[in-house]
Amino acid sequence: MASQTQGIQQLLAAEKKAAEKVAEARKRKARRLKQAKDEATEEIEKFRQERERAFKEFEAKHMGSREGVAAKIDADIRVKLADMDRAIQTRKDPFILEILQYVYNISPEVHKNYNHK
């Protein structure tokens, strides 16, 4: 009986040791997965920063700075408004005279669709 108890104890000890090894292997696997995930995240972030930097360079090269674009738009608007003001000043008096002629020179006529019965 003592040999059976000793055999059972050895089996229990072996089972416990195997469970510890399995648990340790799971922990190592979890650590490796976490490390791989961290490395992948870091690599993705580096790639994203590199692409962002390349895009900023491309944008600066082809579009100029935003302030420069805004200044150019403002200058274009000022030029167009000045042109409109000049056009208004040159055409205002003849236009007003033409409108006044229509108002003052009324020639009453019977409408062509009017039927007098």
From Swiss-Prot:
GO terms for molecular function: ATP hydrolysis activity; proton-transporting ATPase activity, rotational mechanism. Disruption phenotype: RNAi-mediated knockdown specifically in pHCl-2 expressing enterocytes delays pupariation and reduces food intake. However, knockdown in other enterocytes has no effect on developmental timing. Keywords: Hydrogen ion transport, Ion transport, Transport. Disulfide bonds: none annotated. GO terms for cellular component: plasma membrane proton-transporting V-type ATPase complex; presynapse; vacuolar proton-transporting V-type ATPase, V1 domain. It comes from the Eukaryota. V-ATPase is a heteromultimeric enzyme made up of two complexes: the ATP-hydrolytic V1 complex and the proton translocation V0 complex. The V1 complex consists of three catalytic AB heterodimers that form a heterohexamer, three peripheral stalks each consisting of EG heterodimers, one central rotor including subunits D and F, and the regulatory subunits C and H. The proton translocation complex V0 consists of the proton transport subunit a, a ring of proteolipid subunits c9c'', rotary subunit d, subunits e and f, and the accessory subunits VhaAC45 and ATP6AP2. This is V-type proton ATPase subunit G. It comes from Drosophila melanogaster (Fruit fly). The gene is Vha13.
